[in-house]
């Protein structure tokens, strides 16, 4: 807690204060607050190509949304039912250490590439990166007793691709939220982002029980 307090105090001092970041000291009635609340949603859904944007928010992470719910069960389940039969400690290292390293590196490199070439140039490569790297788990599901090293490499590739591809997703949300009420609009976008993970994830377990890991 002391560390977080120190970091928060530093950021309070170091971060810039743009002119738009000012406290509204004028007295407002409850009716005005509710009116602004609904105006925020109204202006969001009146944005240009809003339904295309919502479809993008919901579908961009579709493969990952289904995969992420089943990674741990797949790694832990016995071999005779299609899993890899890893121990809990092995899964902790594979997904909690190697996977996090891949995710972090992918995000850093994705940010560098997007800063140099822009979102328009990197959107499709990042989208393919997020989806195609999920095929590493297709390989693991068909591989005959893959070694722990192979599992680590596959998880690293998949998580690296996810981190790299997620950069484009976050930049798109930021760009789409620009304009009036941009902070509130970004919050609404993150709600659709969460929905895009939750809905496919709800069906992932049913699909696995129906067709198995293969």
Positions of the model-derived regions?
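C-terminal ends and interior cores of transmembrane alpha-helices
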Residues: 128-146
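Intracellular juxtamembrane helix-capping segments at the cytosolic ends
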Residues: 164-178
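Juxtamembrane intracellular "pre-TM" segments in multi-pass secondary transporters
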Residues: 19-52
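A membrane-interface helix-boundary motif in multi-pass transporters
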Residues: 1-2, 206-214
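Loop-to-transmembrane helix entry/capping segments in MFS-fold secondary transporters
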Residues: 88-89, 179-189
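C-terminal membrane-cytosol helix-exit motif in multi-pass small-molecule transporters
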Residues: 2-22
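Short amphipathic helix-loop junctions that connect adjacent transmembrane helices
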Residues: 60, 69-91
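Helix-to-loop junctions at the C-terminal end of transmembrane segments
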Residues: 105-124, 208-209
């Amino acid at each position: 807690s002391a560390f977080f307090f120190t970091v928060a105090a530093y950021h309070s001092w170091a971060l810039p204060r743009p002119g738009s970041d000012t406290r509204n000291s004028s007295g407002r009635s409850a009716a005005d607050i509710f009116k602004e609340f609904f105006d925020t949603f109204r202006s969001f859904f009146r944005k240009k190509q809003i339904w295309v944007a919502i479809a993008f928010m919901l579908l961009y992470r579709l493969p990952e949304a289904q995969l992420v719910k089943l990674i741990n069960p797949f790694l832990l389940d016995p071999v005779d039912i299609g899993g890899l039969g890893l121990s809990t400690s092995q899964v902790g290292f594979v997904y909690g250490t190697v996977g996090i390293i891949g995710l972090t590196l992918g995000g850093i490199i994705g940010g560098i590439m997007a800063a140099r070439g822009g979102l328009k140039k990197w959107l499709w490569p990042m989208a393919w990166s997020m989806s195609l790297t999920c095929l590493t788990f297709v390989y693991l599901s068909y591989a005959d007793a893959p070694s722990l090293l192979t599992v680590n490499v596959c998880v690293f590739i998949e998580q690296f691709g996810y981190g790299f591809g997620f950069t484009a997703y976050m930049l798109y949300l930021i760009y789409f939220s620009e304009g009036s009420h941009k902070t509130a609009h970004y919050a609404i976008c993150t709600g659709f982002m969460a929905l895009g993970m939750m809905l496919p994830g709800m069906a992932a377990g049913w699909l696995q029980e129906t067709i198995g890991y293969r």
